[in-house]
Amino acid sequence: MFFFNTKPIVFLVVLSVVATFAAATPAMLARGGGSSCAPSTSLKCCDHVGTFSEVSPYINPLELVGVIAALLGLVGGLFTSVTLALTCSGIDIGGSCNSQTVCCENVVFNGLVNVGCTAIDIL
């Protein structure tokens, strides 16, 4: 019979399993032409994303005045191509988003309406 110390072998097996799982951990990467958020923007998870005409049916009439004022201040009145994001919440590191992930420049009404957004896809 062969008697030998199995502790080093068990250690190497456990170490290789841990290294395999660490290497297989998914990373959050921007894809689809988007980029990660710039320092002046914030990462949000939003229910409705689009131009003013696309998201206007989802805007509460009481919030509409603030949205238009923010758009006018952002681009001098030419806001047809600016992307808006509605009903947004912040995303923490390791968090998930079941709606559209965006990076937004301006936040109006504490995240309810976001102006100057860029949609990104997170892997």
From Swiss-Prot:
Database matches in Pfam families: Hydrophobin
Q: Which family does it belong to?
A: Belongs to the fungal hydrophobin family.
According to the record's subunit comment, the protein's assembly and interactions are: Self-assembles to form functional amyloid fibrils called rodlets. Self-assembly into fibrillar rodlets occurs spontaneously at hydrophobic:hydrophilic interfaces and the rodlets further associate laterally to form amphipathic monolayers.
| Protein known as | Unclassified hydrophobin 9
Entry keyword set: Cell wall, Disulfide bond, Secreted, Signal
S-S pairs: C37-C103, C45-C97, C46-C88, C104-C117
Originating species: Pleurotus ostreatus (strain PC15)
Task: Write out the GO cellular component annotations.
Answer: extracellular region; fungal-type cell wall; membrane
**What is the recorded function of this protein according to its Swiss-Prot or TrEMBL entry?**
Aerial growth, conidiation, and dispersal of filamentous fungi in the environment rely upon a capability of their secreting small amphipathic proteins called hydrophobins (HPBs) with low sequence identity. Class I can self-assemble into an outermost layer of rodlet bundles on aerial cell surfaces, conferring cellular hydrophobicity that supports fungal growth, development and dispersal; whereas Class II form highly ordered films at water-air interfaces through intermolecular interactions but contribute nothing to the rodlet structure.
**Range of residues in the leader sequence:** 1-24
Give compartment(s). Answer: Secreted; Secreted, Cell wall
Q: Gene behind this chain? A: Hydph9
By its UniProt entry, which SMART domains does this protein fall under? HYDRO
In its UniProt record, a GO molecular function of this protein is:
structural constituent of cell wall
